[in-house]
């Protein structure tokens, strides 16, 4: 086997040089592949194997190598795979390799036979691996790019010296620990017997382990989900029956000790005894239908009672029954029962209950639909042209994962309250008519900025002259040259800083064309369609005349907008059919807005009239519209013929469907033409280079697929061949498929892309780690969630909801989200790392805060909730742990979507410490013993969490809306000022009673808290959600006199009172509410870092495709029905392009600011 060592190459694109095939027939298959050189000066790399050795020993779990170890043996001489460190692009035999052919042309069968004895020395496992050489790894890869650093963008083509070693030396090296580590990491897929059934979700680093009882729910299948919920309800009903038996015994004992003269108490206790007996003897199917009504009536009676033993008995009975009622409510919130009930709390006070309201609900729905239809018809007649011009914009998509309800259009039944609304509240509710609601529903939602709608209309499009000025902003204001470069956070390729803006837009379009899960031909077609639309919108420079320019200037904005609408429609709908548009919307603020933000601290309107700083990635227009809006200037940096040539190459490669050697020859010719197109580009990192590299990657993928198909046919027809030749063909097929060149494995984001630094915190559903992206050096916080835990806790939909919300939101007070991906056992969410810790940790250190500091924090929470509620998102899990502090000292909300499932799972926690004894009132001896064992089991597996911050309507299992968040704000404000939550107690049952009884230990006023703070907390903690402050929106909260000194317009830009002084990688500000005990992690199969390394190792991830992210059939793990549906996480992986582009902009703005400051400091001061 003839091999040559790779030359030290540029750190941007290290490339392999050779591959060998075992037969002369295969030698005709591959030809010499030309290189695509860069246009800058040559620079040779240094220390080519230093980083590779570090990563190898780290992945293999061994310590650092000794400095006096023997001379490094190049793994390429042993036929090993490339070690995927993800700090540089994976190697390609088809890219930039004109200096060395894929196979030595003069090599024949004899040469192959001579080389076989050398390969035989290696372990048998090496025969199954691909024979690609390991490219050099530059030491500066994976580090942040310094702005003063000039990087070469050209790959040298120097000759590579061969590796000379004897058979004895080779045998000695194969026994070294370092070689064994490399062998373990780079070993390919191993064959396994077909008769062995593998449950990959049951495996961890230590082998097979059993999970606790699985509770199955299938995502997206209504029947299975309903059956799973009912199964859990039936099991919960058994526990409730046992608790009711104990409660009935308590009532009998109380009745015996109550004197006959106290008739009122005796009658009340007897009624509760009858109610408890009826509930306990009621079948589960009947109780499922009547549970909500029973809880509703009991709560109405409870509110009429004075404090005393009878009210306490009602509290205890409600505490028991709401465990089942919350499951019923969870089923309604999941969208499987559509009950439109409009009365909320006032109707239950009048004696009107769900069975009486169905007809009223239907009539109201019909009236509301008629009103909305009339409004739609009027608006269609009045503004038909404007509606057409705004169709192509990236309209915000309402996120309705957490259902929003209000006083007149609720899908849920809320708890009743004794107090009727005051006159002011009635006036407020009268103004909230169905017509007004219909108008608000049909308004287009644009995240973060309602004024962004203007950008979709012709009036919102800047003129050509304005575009030219805008496109020149970065170069004019920063004066950057090609000497300054940075790594693009989208494609992780080095680009000139001067072209960051244009490249970010172009790179996003190219990345979206290359969606995962679609065959390569379709992706090439999408690339071709994008290029075709770009060509249709641009005028070739050679045909531009003064008359043509004048005619172009006179084009109507409406006709231009129609063209852009068509482009947006094809690029947004056709290219993104696999992922919702709201999850892929990429847009960048117009440069004048960015200029205003950076130079004059400009602001933008939020949903309720307040002004907050614009987000760098607030969706406004589609990315194709924004790209084409500057085409007059971009055409000076691009070439029409080159783009047209890229289009022809993409189409021609996509149309290659014949499996044969002629197709491979044709693709090599196309690659040669592609090389010259990219080489002759007029500017770096723009359309020609960015789309050219994307086409090149797709061409590689299709080339490898065709090679695999050809070799598959040869292997199938080689039964009559000698064993040696047949085995060689098998190795060739394996080489093509298992090679790290496989683009589908290379392009997927994985945990290997990140270097795990340290754990940050632990929550009820997962753990958070501090990590660094190897390619860029950026710090992120990675939330790690076990698939098995998510399924067992019925949290699959919850984590998907959190992911979707994080993708959709754009607000300075909400944490930013960048990636989501999976491996065999874990789910990963990658978010921005905020080194200031959280509010809970701050309170643990300081005890409590003064009012001025608390006022700022609560005001920022109010702005965050104002934004979330404007896009129909209810947080429902607000607590100090979920309020993070960024490096500037401002608040950011996190942990979305977990409150709903977290509430259901916390049912066991809310069961309290009441003992069941040995005698139940309704239960028999067998069921008593079984229930006692079940309670012990629940204590062991109880879900961590606290109900301190939950609103009473959530605890009672009733419907709830946005006002539930305002209740939590009141609890947080009390804790921030006093030091403890207002309803804190030793047991969950006592906390439950304190909340529904509104038992608040008020501090002295005004000695300990001010009158304004007391009044705000009192109004936020109002039992009736309709009368609670914030019921009509965040405006009334912001107008409270507690916030009289707050400037809402500039709050996000004000300097915070507490600014973290920690280093970027410091996690000392985080103090987890839950005890971190690594010794307990053996239940889950190892330590914290085992989840990130062993279970998601290099070899397992390379062979794990997106469609294979499943947890297998759950029929064998649940007590529910026999499900044939698999839990699939195939759509979980996501790359948030808009937020990654915002990092590019943040870096450029930061560099511009530092340059201005440096110039100001160096400028001579005028003499006075």
Swiss-Prot record:
Entry's transmembrane regions: none
Zinc-finger listed as a keyword: yes
Expression by tissue: Highly expressed in roots, elongating root hair cells and pollen grains.
Stretches assigned to the Protein kinase domain: 754-1043
Residues where ATP binds: 760-768, 783
Effect of loss of the gene: Reduced root hair length.
Comp. bias (Low complexity): 16-25
Name of the protein described by the UniProt record: Probable serine/threonine protein kinase IRE
Protein source organism: Arabidopsis thaliana
């Amino acid at each position: 086997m003839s091999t040559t060592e790779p030359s030290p190459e540029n750190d941007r694109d290290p490339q392999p040089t050779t591959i060998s095939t075992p037969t002369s027939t295969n030698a005709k298959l591959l030809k010499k592949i030309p290189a695509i050189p860069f246009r800058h000066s040559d620079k040779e790399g240094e220390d080519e194997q230093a980083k590779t050795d570090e990563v190898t020993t780290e992945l293999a779990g061994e310590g650092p190598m000794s400095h006096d170890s023997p001379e490094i043996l190049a793994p390429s001489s042993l036929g090993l795979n490339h070690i995927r460190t993800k700090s540089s692009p994976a190697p390609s035999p088809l890219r930039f390799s004109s200096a060395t052919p894929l196979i030595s042309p003069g090599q024949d069968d004899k040469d192959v036979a001579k080389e076989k004895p050398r390969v035989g020395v290696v372990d048998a496992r090496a025969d199954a691996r691909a024979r690609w050489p390991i490219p050099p790894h530059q030491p500066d890869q994976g580090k942040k790019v310094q702005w003063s650093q000039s990087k070469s963008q050209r790959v040298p083509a120097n000759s590579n010296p061969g590796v000379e070693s004897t058979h004895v030396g080779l045998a000695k090296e194969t026994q070294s620990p370092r070689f064994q580590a490399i062998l373990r990491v780079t070993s390919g897929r191993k064959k396994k017997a077909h008769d062995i059934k593998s449950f990959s979700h049951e495996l961890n680093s230590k082998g097979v382990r059993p999970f606790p009882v699985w509770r199955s729910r299938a995502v997206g299948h209504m029947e299975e989900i309903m059956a799973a919920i009912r199964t859990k309800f039936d099991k919960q009903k058994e526990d409730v029956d046992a608790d009711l038996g104990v409660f009935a015994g308590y009532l009998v004992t109380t009745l015996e000790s109550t004197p006959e003269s106290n008739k009122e108490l005796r009658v009340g206790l007897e009624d509760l005894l009858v109610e408890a007996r009826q509930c306990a003897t009621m079948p589960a199917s009947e109780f499922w239908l009547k549970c909500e009504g029973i809880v509703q009536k009991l709560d109405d009676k409870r509110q009429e009672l004075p404090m005393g033993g009878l009210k306490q008995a009602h509290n205890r009975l409600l505490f028991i029954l709401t465990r089942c009622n919350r499951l019923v409510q969870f089923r309604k919130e999941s969208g499987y029962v559509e009950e439109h009930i409009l009365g909320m709390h006032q109707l239950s006070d009048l004696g009107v209950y769900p069975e009486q309201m169905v007809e009223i609900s239907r009539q109201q729905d019909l009236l509301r639909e008629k009103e909305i239809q009339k409004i739609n018809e009027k608006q269609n007649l009045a503004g038909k042209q404007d509606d057409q011009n705004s169709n192509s914009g990236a309209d915000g998509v309402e996120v309705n994962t957490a259902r929003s309800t209000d006083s007149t259009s609720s899908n849920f039944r809320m708890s009743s309250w004794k107090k009727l609304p005051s006159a002011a509240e009635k006036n407020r509710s009268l103004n909230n008519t169905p017509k007004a609601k219909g108008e608000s529903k049909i308004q287009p939602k644009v995240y973060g900025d309602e004024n962004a709608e203007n950008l979709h209309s012709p009036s919102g499009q800047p003129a050509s002259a304005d575009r030219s000025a805008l496109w020149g902003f970065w170069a004019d204001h920063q004066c950057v040259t090609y000497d300054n470069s940075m790594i693009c956070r989208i494609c992780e390729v080095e680009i000139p800083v001067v072209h960051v803006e244009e490249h970010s837009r172009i790179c996003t379009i190219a990345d979206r064309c290359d969606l995962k899960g679609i065959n390569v031909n379709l992706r090439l077609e999408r690339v071709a369609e994008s290029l075709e639309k770009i060509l249709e919108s641009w005028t070739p420079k050679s045909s531009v005349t003064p008359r043509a320019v004048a005619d172009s200037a006179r084009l109507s904005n409406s006709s231009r907008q129609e063209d852009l609408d068509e482009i947006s429609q094809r690029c947004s709908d056709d290219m993104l059919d696999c992922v919702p548009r709201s999850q892929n919307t990429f847009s960048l603020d117009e440069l004048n807005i960015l200029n205003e933000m950076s130079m004059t601290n400009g602001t933008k309107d939020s949903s309720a009239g307040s002004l907050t700083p614009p987000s760098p990635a607030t969706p406004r227009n589609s990315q194709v519209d924004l790209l084409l809006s500057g085409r007059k200037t971009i055409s000076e940096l691009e070439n029409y013929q080159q783009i047209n040539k890229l289009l022809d190459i993409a189409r021609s490669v996509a149309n290659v469907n014949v499996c044969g050697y002629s197709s491979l020859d044709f693709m090599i010719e196309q690659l040669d033409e592609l090389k010259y197109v990219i080489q002759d580009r007029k500017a770096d990192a723009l359309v020609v280079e960015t789309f050219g590299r994307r086409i090149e990657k797709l061409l590689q993928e299709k080339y490898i697929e065709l090679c695999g198909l050809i070799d598959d046919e040869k292997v199938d027809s080689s039964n009559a061949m000698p064993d040696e030749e047949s085995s060689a063909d098998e190795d060739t097929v394996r080489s093509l498929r298992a090679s790290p060149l496989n683009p589908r494995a290379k392009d997927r984001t994985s945990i290997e892309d990140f270097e795990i630094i340290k754990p940050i915190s632990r929550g009820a559903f997962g753990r958070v780690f501090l990590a660094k992206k190897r390619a860029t050096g950026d710090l992120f916080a990675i939330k790690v969630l076990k698939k098995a835990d998510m399924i067992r806790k019925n949290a699959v939909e919850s984590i998907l909801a959190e992911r979707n919300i994080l993708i959709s939101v754009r607000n300075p007070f909400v944490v930013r989200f960048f990636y989501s991906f999976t491996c065999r056992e874990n789910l990963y969410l990658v978010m921005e790392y905020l080194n200031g810790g959280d509010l809970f940790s701050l309170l643990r250190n300081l005890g409590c805060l003064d009012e001025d500091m608390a006022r700022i924090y609560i005001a920022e929470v109010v702005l965050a909730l104002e934004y979330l509620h404007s896009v129909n998102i209810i947080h429902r899990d607000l607590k100090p742990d979920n309020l993070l502090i960024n490096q500037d000292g401002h608040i950011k909300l996190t942990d979305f979507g977990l409150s709903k499932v977290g509430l259901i799972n916390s049912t066991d926690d809310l069961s309290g410490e009441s003992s069941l004894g040995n005698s139940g009132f309704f239960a028999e001896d067998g069921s008593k013993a079984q229930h006692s064992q079940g309670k012990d089991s629940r204590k062991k597996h109880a879900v961590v969490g606290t109900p301190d911050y939950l609103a009473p309507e959530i605890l009672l299992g009733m419907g709830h809306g946005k006002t539930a968040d305002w209740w939590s704000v009141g609890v947080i404000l009390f804790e921030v000022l006093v030091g403890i939550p207002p309803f804190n107690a030793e047991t969950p049952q006592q906390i439950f009673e304190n909340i529904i009884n509104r038992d608040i230990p008020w501090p002295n006023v005004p000695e300990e808290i001010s009158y304004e703070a007391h009044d705000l907390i009192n109004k936020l903690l109002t039992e009736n959600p309709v009368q609670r402050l914030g019921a009509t929106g965040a405006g009334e909260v912001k107008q409270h006199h507690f916030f009289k000194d707050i400037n809402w317009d500039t709050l996000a830009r004000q300097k915070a009172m507490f600014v973290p002084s920690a280093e970027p990688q410091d996690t000392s500000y985080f103090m987890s509410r839950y005890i971190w005990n690594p010794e307990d992690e053996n239940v889950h199969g190892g330590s914290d870092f085992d989840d990130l390394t062993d279970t998601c190792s290099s070899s397992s991830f390379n062979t794990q495709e997106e469609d294979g992210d499943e947890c297998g059939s759950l029929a064998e793990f649940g007590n529910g029905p026999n499900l044939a549906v698999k839990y699939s996480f195939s759509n979980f992986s996501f790359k948030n392009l808009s937020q990654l582009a915002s990092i590019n902009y943040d870096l450029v703005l930061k560099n511009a600011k530092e340059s201005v400051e440096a110039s100001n400091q160096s400028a001579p001061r005028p003499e006075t």
